[in-house]
Amino acid sequence: MAANISLQPTSMRDVTKMERIGVHSHIHGLGLDSNLEPRASSQGMIGQGKARKAAGVILKMVQEGRIAGRAILMAGPPSTGKTALAMAMTQTLGSDVPFVMLTASEVFSLEISKTESLTQAFRRAIGVRIKEETELIEGEVVEIQVDRSVTGATKTGRLTLKTTDMETVYDLGSKMIDQLQKEKVLAGDVVSIDKASGRISKLGRSFGRAKDYDAMGADTRFVACPDGELQTRKEVVHTVSLHEIDVINSRTQGFLALFAGDTGEIKPELRAQINGKVAEWREEGKAEIVPGVLFIDEVHMLDIECFSFLNRAMENELAPLVVMASNRGITRIRGTKYKSPHGIPADLLDRMLIISTNRYEEDEMREIVKIRAEEEDVRLSPAALDLLATMGIQTSLRYSLNLIAPSSLLAQRRKSPQTDVEDVRMAYKYFCDVERSAQYAKETSGMMFGETEEINGGMEVDA
C-alpha cells in the first residue's frame, strides 16, 4: 500500500529582524548647516540652538586636531538633551575619530583602581592612524589546478589570474591551496592576495560570469574585472586606539585579551614605552595621532580623587577632548564637605568651556514627540500629539516619550489604526509620573519604610 505523500508546497515563514529602538536612535547628527547655524529641525535634533552651535564649533576644532586636551561641560536640568548632544557629536564625527562614552559610576570597580579606569578611558579615546604600503595581486581567477602527490602528503598547484590587460600563472604551495579552499574561491571570482601575509580576500564575482548560474545567493556580489597590472602597491591605513596597543603588549596572549575584556592594571612603564614608540612613528611619518572625544555622563558622581587626576591628565600631551555632563546645581563634591557648582571643584571648572542647555518649549516638545513616534512606528492623532506635548511640559520629556509605546499598545487592543487621546489618558492613568508617585509616597508614608535618624540616647525612630 502506497503511502500518502503530500505534494503541497511547504509554507514559508517570514522571519522579521528584531530591531531595538534606543532612546537616542532617532539622532543622526547635530543638524547644522555649512555655516554651523542650527536648523529648526534636522537630523533628529530639535531646539537648543546655542548649545548645538557651540558643539558644532568644538567638533570643527576636533576634526582639525586643534582642541585636544580641553574640557567641555554640558550643564542643564534633566531632560534638556545633554546626552542627545553627545550622541549627535558621535554621529557627526564618524567612525574614524574615536568617541568613548562613560558614565561616572563605571569608574568605581573592585578589580582596578579609579585612576586606572580613567586612564584606560583616556587611552581608548586617542587613536593612532598607522600607514603601511602592501603589495597586492588583484585579478579574476581563470583556472585553479591542484596536483596531489602519490602519498597525498603535499599539495601543489597553479593559479591563473587575469586582468583586462594581462594574464599570469602563479605556482601555489599547500598553504595557499588551503586558503583558496577555505575562502571557496572558484573560476570567475575576483580575488585580492596580500603578498606579505598570503591572505586571500574574495572581492566578488566577475560581471563576465554573471550568467553562469540561473540562481545565486543574496550575498553574491558582482564586480568588474580589474584592469592594468596584476601586482599593485596600495597604502593601507589602520586606526587603532592607544589602549588596544597597551593591551596587546601587556599580555602574553596578545590581542585575545581585547576580546576577553580582562585587561587588569597596565604598568606605567609599558605605557611610557608605547608613547615613545608612537612618537618615533610620528617622526618617521608612519603614523599620526587622532585625538578623539571622551564623554563622561553624570560627572558629579566622580569623587575628589578622580577630579584631581583629571586636572593632571587633561594637561598631558596625549589627551583627548573631555566632554562632561551634569544636571546638578550647587551640590557637595563627592569625598569632601565642600559645595561647588555642578559638584565639580572650582579649579577644574576654571579649565572648562561650559555649554548650558535650557528646557524645551511646547512647540519643540511636540516636534520631539512626533519624531519619536515615527521612530517607533506609532501613528498619533493630532490631539494625542498635543496632549503628549502638554504632558512633557507639565511632567518631563522622558515621561511623555515613555507613554508613546503603552498608548500604542492600548490602541491596538481596541483595534484602532492610530493612537488617540483616550489611549494616552488610559496610559497616564496606569503609569504615574514623578510628582504623582511622590504624592502617593507622602499619603502612604505611615505604611512604607522611611529613613531613620538618631535622637537622644541613640534611639532610632521613623523620620
Curated annotation (Swiss-Prot):
Catalysed reactions listed for this entry: ATP + H2O = ADP + phosphate + H(+)
EC number, as in UniProt: 3.6.4.12
GO molecular function annotation: 3'-5' DNA helicase activity; 5'-3' DNA helicase activity; ATP binding; ATP hydrolysis activity; DNA helicase activity
Swiss-Prot/TrEMBL keywords: Activator, ATP-binding, Chromatin regulator, DNA damage, DNA repair, Helicase, Hydrolase, Nucleotide-binding, Nucleus, rRNA processing, Transcription, Transcription regulation
Keyword Iron-sulfur found: no
GO cellular component: Ino80 complex; NuA4 histone acetyltransferase complex; R2TP complex; Swr1 complex
Task performed by this protein: DNA helicase which participates in several chromatin remodeling complexes, including the SWR1 and the INO80 complexes. The SWR1 complex mediates the ATP-dependent exchange of histone H2A for the H2A variant HZT1 leading to transcriptional regulation of selected genes by chromatin remodeling. The INO80 complex remodels chromatin by shifting nucleosomes and is involved in DNA repair. Also involved in pre-rRNA processing.
Protein's name according to its UniProt entry: RuvB-like helicase 2
Originating species: Cryptococcus neoformans var. neoformans serotype D (strain JEC21 / ATCC MYA-565) (Filobasidiella neoformans)
Gene name of this polypeptide: RVB2
